[in-house]
Amino acid sequence: MTVFRQENVDDYYDTGEELGSGQFAVVKKCREKSTGLQYAAKFIKKRRTKSSRRGVSREDIEREVSILKEIRHPNVITLHEVYENKTDVILILELVAGGELFDFLAEKESLTEEEATEFLKQILSGVYYLHSLQIAHFDLKPENIMLLDRNVPKPRIKIIDFGLAHKIDFGNEFKNIFGTPEFVAPEIVNYEPLGLEADMWSIGVITYILLSGASPFLGDTKQETLANVSAVNYDFEEEFFRNTSTLAKDFIRRLLVKDPKKRMTIQDSLQHPWIKPKDTQQALSRKASAVNMEKFKKFAARKKWKQSVRLISLCQRLSRSFLSRSNMSVARSDDTLDEEDSFVMKAIIHAINDDNVPGLQHLLGSLSSYDVNQPNKHGTPPLLIAAGCGNIQMLQLLIKRGSRIDVQDKGGSNAIYWASRHGHVDTLKFLNENKCPLDVKDKSGETALHVAARYGHADVVQLLCSFGSNPDFQDKEEETPLHCAAWHGYYSVAKALCEVGCNVNIKNREGETPLLTASARGYHDIVECLAEHGADLNASDKDGHIALHLAVRRCQMEVIKTLLGHGSFVDFQDRHGNTPLHVACKDGSAPIVVALCEASCNLDISNKYGRTPLHLAANNGILDVVRYLCLMGANVEALTSDGKTAEDLAKAEQHEHVAGLLARLRKDTHRGLFIQQLRPTQNLQPRIKLKLFGHSGSGKSTLVESLKCGLLRSFFRRRRPRLSSTNSTRFPPSPLAAKPTVSVSINNLYPGCENVSVRSRSMMFEPGLTKGMLEVFVAPSHHLHCSTDDQSTKAIDIQNAYLNGVGDFSVWEFSGNPVYFCCYDYFAANDPTSIHIIVFSLEEPYEIQLNQVIFWLSFLKSLVPVEEPIAFGGKLKNPLRVVLVATHADIMNIPRPAGGEFGYDKDTSLLKEIRNRFGNDLHVSNKLFVLDAGASGSKDIKVLRNHLQEIRSQIVSGCSPMTHLCEKIISTLPSWRKLNGPNQLMSLQQFVYDVQDQLNPLASEDDLRRIAQQLHSTGEINIMQSETVQDVLLLDPRWLCTNVLGKLLSVETPRALHHYRGRYTMEDIQRLVPDSDVEELLQILDAMDICARDLSSGTMVDIPALIKTDSLQRSWADEEDEVMVYGGVRIVPVEHLTPFPCGIFHKVQVNLCRWIHQQSAEGDADIRLWVSGCRIANRGAELLVLLVNHGQGIEVQVRGLETEKIKCCLLLDSVCSTIETVMATTLPGLLTVKHYLSPQQLREHHEPVMVYQPRDFFRAQTLKESSLTNTMGGYKESFSSITCFGCHDVYSQASLGMDIHASDLSLLTRRKLSRLLDPPDPMGKDWCLLAMNLGLPDMVAKHNVNNRASRDFLPSPVHALLQEWTSYPESTVGILISKLRELGRRDAADFLLKASSVFKINLDGNGQEAYASSCNSGTSYNSISSVVSRRDSHAWTPLYDL
């Protein structure tokens, strides 16, 4: 449902005189306070209920507003704003003050056809615009054709009143009967499908009247008029058309055609010779012909007085009928009165509904003998209708005219009842003051208090009770008003009735109290209120059920908690002897069973059939409930009335799993042991994980060995020999001896990264695709990631170790070789109870040290998803604990005082930089540990040990204590690993089954999930979770992380077929990991995005991480491509221009391989991979995906034939969606954005290529431009050519930059805004002032946290503010940026300029859609496909056929 502005319109506009009114709308002149400009305010009365006939339905109002928002034309009225209050929707419209066109023309002495056509052209122009948008007005008539200003030389026409207008969907048939009889088309009268043609008929009628002063189809009655229309019964009478030209008659004749298909269209009308003469003779003929002004003036006058004359005539006839009533026969009297009363009553009711007091007063003044107490055909007198509408002036008028205050409708309801039903407090006060009876019952026994309670009017209930209304009256079903409130869930009403002292324990005909009713229907707040006001919690209905029974039966958990909290008797038995626990066990609701047992219910009560709750659960085969009852001590040997145990019942119903469980629990000693195993012990968790990250050669392995050394062992420990730099790539040459700014370790990460600066640099110009970062590859063998070192860590080395002076750890050492990085996302940041050590070498220059640390911290940060709801300041509840360690302090001769610690002069600046970037995302220790990793007995190592021990103690104290079952599982795991054979993977469901089957049958799935999480925390197992891998347990992490991945991805593995392209057969994989089930292994590797299986090529497997070749073409040849279109994007991180975490591009390549394998069933698609890119060919379109800018961006370039723009759009969008999905799932904490490449430079193969950033588009939009300047080429490029290859069909359905709805802002973007704007600003430039600027002052009081003690984990007020504000359709990114700038928060505005999407396809052609962003940025494939599917000029090939 569309939400309009909820502010009080009077705060923004001064309302003046009434300009006009209709059945359900009043138009008043108004002035905008801020600008002084005048507008017209149209107050549309809303329909309160769907069944009501008073007011306009919400759907009709929204349709009118939607159409008005869409149209902008000089000859059509313009919508300014829309407000809404409780009763009305207020449209602020352009003020059209010139009056009706026909009134203006009637004042003229003469009028030629040429002059008339000038006005008609304006009408046609407006209708042409509407029809071009597929909008049909359906109510074109003289009253709706106005002049903007009649006092100018050439008045401008405005078409108004779009209440009946519809957007025509040619795919769906539309029929309706509406409009003014004189002007409706035959298809409306005949209830045939309607379209734009209906407006053309109306234009024909208007033209006929304009030229002649006569109406072509007007009859004496409405039925005669409609009959004339249907028969097209008209002619050009000489009296009226003697001076009319032949062309004018031909124009009318072509419009008044019964068959809509043969009727002139708006385009035909504009080209008709009468409107657009083809030669001089036609023009002169038009100028010589004249409008019949005599008749036209009479028509205008007749129209003005027509309604008044009819009313007077009818009123006179009515008066005469009253005077002669006594002289008429009964039958005659009834007939006449029925007919005439129907008319008068309709007029009265219309006046009441329209709040037209003067009109009703005038009407009743003309009907001096009319009895205003007589009811309408539904049995309702006018006074009651007026009471329902709430107009006190109307009531005063009716009472003055003789209405009885105690009049009733045919159902026995009086005015108090009607006013109460509709919630009119002031009306009730008026009626009470005028002695209207208060507690009158209608035919169903209901009073006004009943109906007020049923409709939820708490203020009315309070008022009626204050008048003295009896709150305990019962209707014919013996229900009180409190029953009504409890049934419908109106808490405020129930509270009001309780506070006035009503009897809360009255029962209805079914024996239900209000408490029973509220409990059954789940209204826990009402249950709470009733309990606090003395409701009997154990009152029962006719079946002996108390409230707790009914709540359990309906699974109303909140109600159950409330009843138990107030002391409801948990063991109450109904007439069948069933307690609430019996009901819960029969229905199988485990959470409710748990709640009842925690309330100390009796587990072994038998019902009338001798069955306990355990019998019912076993009989129904509900294993979880049976297990829990047994755990809580239920008697498994209890017998039913016919001598059967629960086990017997389970066997009889063939519930073998339940019977087996009960059989194992026959002996109490066994059950006691099982129960004891599940209880927490005093033992703390024995071990947590210690994870080490760092580049190759940073000293991770050496540091681990040193930490393991005890004092005595450290004296005898021999330092590992340092190999010569000329013989080993693990220890690169000293930076002083080689290039001063080049780090081999950073080269291991990305070729060319030696030039990466820690500060953000411009991405405006980039090196060519065949130069720069890829020049480092002379031959595959020269790539450092192919080097071999027997001492280097393979994949992830895992060992359980005791670190001397610290404690037990599961140590996970992550290799610094980039070939392994594609598997780290599943293991690096999946446990907040781990300690993460980032190790870097002081041998590197400071800039490289900082880059290395930032790289690993960015990796960890990117792996942590956004938590919802976003906390105050965007903080995380459990940030990862990180320790920074700098090694090789001895080699670099870092100064150290005698017996002291190393003193690194850059530690303060490094820590400051790290905290600025990662302080909100990671818990980084305040100290940088500078040490010699091999000196196990040094003070520096000791200080590090103390710090690790302190962190370990904090983490372990927050972990759950161990249970005997967890310890038992740990001792059993080795045998399970051995039994599991070649693969150590197990589903959680299988794990639960095995534990229950072999170790403890009473352990529930929830128990075992907690234990599995604890085992995961200790490093015994690893729980693998992602969108593709869910609840998979890795029983032996070493098997996968060290053995399988270490062998599969290692550069030491034997060469296999196509190894240079990373392409293997199943047999190759089997040879690499001979001890594994290759089929199952590939399934998990495929799910981890390490490989992609190509089923279309037999049993081939792509593993991009193993690709060695870099000799493939990485750009398009410099050839003549005059008929080709080019385009592309670059996906980059938003906040810091750092390399993407390594391994992500391998995953992108895997997903593109998988995508192409799915597309190429017929062999039409092809993909070629190399180290830092891939090339895709797909039926006339080609695509390059490249890792560029030293790993800081992923570039997607597309080219295709000029005639295949749609294919290019689809291909680019699909690949970008694939990449963004990989980013969002693999690195959920990384915010990315798309930059756009210059299509002209791509076409010219010009390097470097211009890169357009979001702020470039926003700046151009602000300047009202639709193109961007390529400063390199010296020319401009249009938005459409940059974003969608110049494809008009796609571009026309898109929103651009500032016009994109703000709800598309991702969670990561919102979290960043929370960090910027949540903290109080000394100058007040924070979220509070932003809320005021956005027109949401109520949010300030609602979310103000200044008075609260702690802000650590309060919800973010900025997030709440954006959620509220983005629910409005006019909330765009551009408005938000402008509001932030007005606030003085340029930092937040600049961030949005960097992070916002540039181009978004709108699914809804009318404008807004249900906004839901599923990616970090960009458009979705589905949206562009939907645009393509609506094109009916070509049959586009689906993407999978491209």
UniProtKB/Swiss-Prot annotation:
Enzyme active site: D139 (proton acceptor)
Cofactor: Mg(2+)
Summary of the tissues where the protein is detected: High levels in bladder, uterus, vas deferens, lung, liver and kidney.
Boundaries of every Protein kinase domain copy: 13-275
Keywords of the record: ANK repeat, Apoptosis, ATP-binding, Calmodulin-binding, GTP-binding, Kinase, Nucleotide-binding, Phosphoprotein, Repeat, Serine/threonine-protein kinase, Transferase, Translation regulation, Ubl conjugation
GO biological process terms held by the UniProt record: apoptotic process; apoptotic signaling pathway; cellular response to hydroperoxide; cellular response to type II interferon; defense response to tumor cell; extrinsic apoptotic signaling pathway via death domain receptors; intracellular signal transduction; negative regulation of apoptotic process
Comment, domains: The autoinhibitory domain sterically blocks the substrate peptide-binding site by making both hydrophobic and electrostatic contacts with the kinase core.
The name this protein goes by in its record: Death-associated protein kinase 1
Species assigned in the record: Mus musculus (Mouse)
